[in-house]
Amino acid sequence: MKNPENISGAIRDEMKSIGLWDMHPRNLYRVSWKNEPVSEGGNYGAVNAMVIPKEITGVKANIIGLVGKWFPTGAHKVGATYGCIAPALVTGQFDPSSTKAVWPSTGNYCRGGAYISSLLGCESVAILPEGMSRERFEWLQK
């Protein structure tokens, strides 16, 4: 979300009681690089980024890294998956009453897809390769 400051005050107040990783439709408003860096009840602020010191990079130019930790699920892939499914829903190309969303990946993309699908009320299938960590499978089973 490019301009979270445009979200109504009533919705922002409601979000104060919703955790960043909760399965709650209001967390669709948190698909943003500008989430306040707190796990419970946050609102918005500056872009979540950090300047990597020149002592580490070895170059004179500023190198800035974006921080995905403060997205729902702790991974920025919720943005990528929302960007895939939202246009299909809006244009009618995807009908959640008769179609499942399928999210194949090695981890965060399918996690983001399953999460966003759930918030939108869409049934989904997350596909992980066999050798992935037990934690990823357990998270998806929830």
Model-derived segments and spans:
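PLP-dependent amino-acid enzyme catalytic core
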Residues: M1-K142
